[in-house]
Amino acid sequence: MTINILAIGDVVGGCGVSCLERHLRAVKKLKNIHFTVVNGENAAMVGLTPNDAERIFSAGADVITLGNHTFGKMQITDYLDDCPYILRPHNLGARVPGRGYGVFDCGRARIAVMNLIGRCDLAFHADNPFKTADELLKSGEKPTFTLLDFHAEATSEKLAMAYYLDGRVSAIWGTHTHVPTADEEVFPKGTGYLTDLGMTGAVRSVLGIKPEQSVETFLGGLPGRYREPEKSAGKMQGAIFTLDDATGLCVGVERVDVR
């Protein structure tokens, strides 16, 4: 039998959270989704607040993953230790709050979710994500499926990770760039892959940010606190991975773009 996993790209600002609230449950019903992972690291533009997290869970997320803005809102710190359904990149190390790996029971299967951050063009002193993935896969857990949200800038690093883990995990998707890619595929050994899910946020924006602010920065103006557009339609982007419980691997990938 197969199971459908929905992965949603970076939720950006109030527009993104509201868009998720409007569309997520309808898409889950329409596509017969069994488990949903949402990247929420930009829900407060830079970071995630406990209130944002509650809204995302209420909208239909089973797990929230994060990225380089994990600690953009420090009030999330205690929440990371208390809530096993929020994951920060595991390779940020053991000294920071939270975890980047969890195994969850969705009724049909036990699903492991890993959250890792890349090291190319990201100013982070993170552990090697490839070696961290190896360590997590050797942890002794025996889930039906294993999923990876790889929060990374470089397409090359994401693709290299996919080849490295092909056949060892069920699905890998990239987050962080906020731009959806058109390279969905099932790799030769059965791992489903998409370089980047895109984002959930304002349509008329620059990666979720008010266009005027972004333009001013590129013209030489001083950078400021990220602001989202006052008015814009929203979009929800991501992908559906269809997984086979007999093999633990992927049999199909479908992009999602709802407006």
Name each model-derived stretch.
Residues 1-259:
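Acidic, metal/ion-coordinating pockets
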